[in-house]
Amino acid sequence: MVQQRGARAKRDGGPPPPGPGPAAEGAREPGWCKTPSGHIKRPMNAFMVWSQHERRKIMDQWPDMHNAEISKRLGRRWQLLQDSEKIPFVREAERLRLKHMADYPDYKYRPRKKSKGAPAKARPRPPGGGGGGSRLKPGPQLPGRGGRRASGGPLGGGAAAPEDDDEDEEEELLEVRLLETPGRELWRMVPAGRAARGPAERAQGPSGEGAAASAASPTLSEDEEPEEEEEEAATAEEGEEETVVSGEEPLGFLSRMPPGPAGLDCSALDRDPDLLPPSGTSHFEFPDYCTPEVTEMIAGDWRSSSIADLVFTY
């Protein structure tokens, strides 16, 4: 019957009428959706029913054409078809779906999972352990707190940790302290713990500064180096005019200033202003719009002998 339809179509010169084709012939077989491995295939849809015949035609015309290119052309042609032309193939796909359900009632679509390739093998590490040159090498340890903690054990011993904490607290609390030098006096921010160790150190002169520094040096931590002391001294010299001074130390600072030309000369402030040469107008000269009473009061004697003279009578 199918061959007769195809022969009639060839004689008429038109396309063969849509019929069941190979899909219907395969449906008559008992295992028409089973593969040799036992896998049950999905029922074909309308496009698959239509593309079976069209694919064969393209393969006959262009046998060297790639399968992907054939699929692209079939997809474009299917989209160009009108809905009325797709109706026969839609009906055939529905019939195949119902037959598939009758033959395989327990069928459930389970798409195959894409097999992931084996994970790439880890690169062999060079002998010697570690990550090679990617890891940073530990630098030389400075002789400071780290060295003291390492010598005391993994945690620096029992008394090393409290001692370090005390030193940190002393460095956080700062206090203004006067440093006396041979030709100059300046203010410096020093740790409060060091300033409180001896109040007598502030009263020492230039000669006692070296002795005070030598006496305080054993109590300082081992990690403080001379370079840090030089930097602190330089910083104190730069900011000597900006530091804030509190307490009684400013009074002592003024009392220890040597008298002389460098000191403050207050004698110029005690001079009588009447003895100064007149320069321009005085601040006691008022314009002409002053009242006679005000002019008389200004011209009169300010140093009255009694309070009664200052009372005005109108």
UniProtKB/Swiss-Prot annotation:
GO CC annotations, alphabetized: nucleoplasm; protein-DNA complex
DNA-binding region range list: 40-108
Comp. bias intervals (Basic and acidic residues): 174-187
InterPro entries membership: HMG_box_dom, HMG_box_dom_sf, SOX-12/11/4, SRY-related_HMG-box_TF-like
Region Required for transcriptional activation activity and synergistic coactivation of transcriptional activity with POU3F2, annotated ranges: 282-314
PROSITE patterns: HMG_BOX_2
Disruption phenotype: Knockout mice are viable, fertile and morphologically normal. Increased expression of Sox11 in brain and cartilage at 14.5 dpc, with increased expression in liver and kidney at 16.5 dpc. Increased expression of Sox4 in spinal cord and cartilage at 14.5 dpc, with increased expression in liver at 16.5 dpc. Sox12 knockout naive CD4-positive T cells fail to differentiate into pT reg cells in mice with dextran sulfate sodium (DSS)-induced colitis. Sox4, Sox11, and Sox12 triple knockout mice are embryonically lethal and show severe thinning and undulation of the neural tube.
Region (Disordered) location: 1-40, 101-287
Expression (tissue specificity): Expressed in splenic and thymic regulatory T-cells (at protein level). Expressed in embryonic molar and incisor teeth.
N-terminal signal peptide: none
Molecular function, one GO term: DNA binding
Biased composition (Low complexity): 191-217
Keyword annotations: Activator, DNA-binding, Nucleus, Transcription, Transcription regulation
Protein name, entry field: Transcription factor SOX-12
The organism of origin for this protein: Mus musculus
Gene (UniProt): Sox12
